Amino acid sequence: MEKQPSMPSEVIENICRVIANTDTGLTGTEIGILLAEALITDTDPTLTKWKRLFNAFAQYQNKNHCSNNILTFLSKAILPVRYVDNPELFKHRLFELNKWLCFV
């Protein structure tokens, strides 16, 4: 796969806030599983969810100078099959993520 450009930290932060939102986001366990599946090191699982995700994404980008595995994580997090029983949550997350991804 071709290297995708790094994302600005402001975009990463807001994506992390969407994905790890207390009410509508992934659980800590889900975040850990998806980080492992995307081959991104979980740098500090004791932090709040969005900070944990932000630090993992930032470390990945700083080391690899691309956003490939972050995009893999997001693709896995938003797979429609994960939302068969809750299509409204899928629509919400997709809408919120796209608001930030349009800046990339």
What residue ranges belong to the model's regions?
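Charged interaction/catalytic cores of defense and host-pathogen modules
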Residues: 1-104
